[in-house]
Amino acid sequence: MATEDVKLIGSWASVYVMRARIALHLKSISYEFLQETYGSKSELLLKSNPVHKKMPVLIHADKPVCESNIIVHYIDEAWNSSGPSILPSHPYDRAIARFWAAYIDDQWFISVRSILTAQGDEEKKAAIAQVEERTKLLEKAFNDCSQGKPFFNGDHIGYLDIALGSFLGWWRVVELDANHKFLDETKTPSLVKWAERFCDDPAVKPIMPEITKLAEFARKLFPKRQA
């Protein structure tokens, strides 16, 4: 990996931190991972992100960059000669990738998270149905974007792969909680194969959270799930 003054403030369990880590690994950038403890904020985090006071924060040459998707953009541009391009080269393809990345964050993930916070069986059933519907849209988006290739971005992991793939660990935790498979060979065959390829990629595999550890963390984060 390339040697530079790079630090990343975050947590092993955060999907947003995962995005930054995958991008750094794709670009073969060495970095110091400064782990935050959930429920507390370090002085460095507050100093580096005084507006939102949230992780992740990438610190490159003492300059902080905040927000996960912005960090991924920055990594792709700052190290454009290292590793494959993360963002598509064509402006239209970049626009499509950004559209679906926003959909994942603003709609799809909200539905997934609502399964963990649902009050009662009926609310959970409604949340599961909504996730099913929105995941089918992502199946179609994958087929349209990939054009028969292994990833949304084509032959290698790119921006949209990172945007969705960073959620895979938590997605499996939600499947366990809901006792329901969302990635299913009969309903989303393309996404099933994509998820396997994504998790096996050398840039992802070493940092993907272990599911039992993540599930235990989720029980602490969402205590009502134990009821």
UniProtKB/Swiss-Prot annotation:
Enzyme Commission number: 2.5.1.18
Localization per record: Cytoplasm, Cytosol
Keyword Cytoplasm: yes
An annotated GO cellular component: cytoplasm
PANTHER family xref list: GLUTATHIONE S-TRANSFERASE U18 (PTHR11260:SF597), GLUTATHIONE S-TRANSFERASE, GST, SUPERFAMILY, GST DOMAIN CONTAINING (PTHR11260)
Class in the EC hierarchy, top level: transferase
GN (gene name): GSTU18
Binding-site residues for glutathione, renumbered to this chain: 14-15, 40-41, 54-55, 67-68
Domain GST C-terminal: 90-221
Homology family: Belongs to the GST superfamily. Tau family.
PROSITE patterns: GST_CTER, GST_NTER
Catalytic activity of the protein: RX + glutathione = an S-substituted glutathione + a halide anion + H(+)
Protein's name according to its UniProt entry: Glutathione S-transferase U18
A Pfam family per the record: GST_N
CDD domains assigned: GST_C_Tau, GST_N_Tau
InterPro entries attached to this UniProt entry: Glutathione-S-Trfase_C-like (IPR010987), Glutathione-S-Trfase_C_sf (IPR036282), Glutathione_S-Trfase_N (IPR004045), GST_C (IPR004046), GST_C_Tau (IPR045074), Omega/Tau-like (IPR045073), Thioredoxin-like_sf (IPR036249)
Highest taxon above the source species: Eukaryota
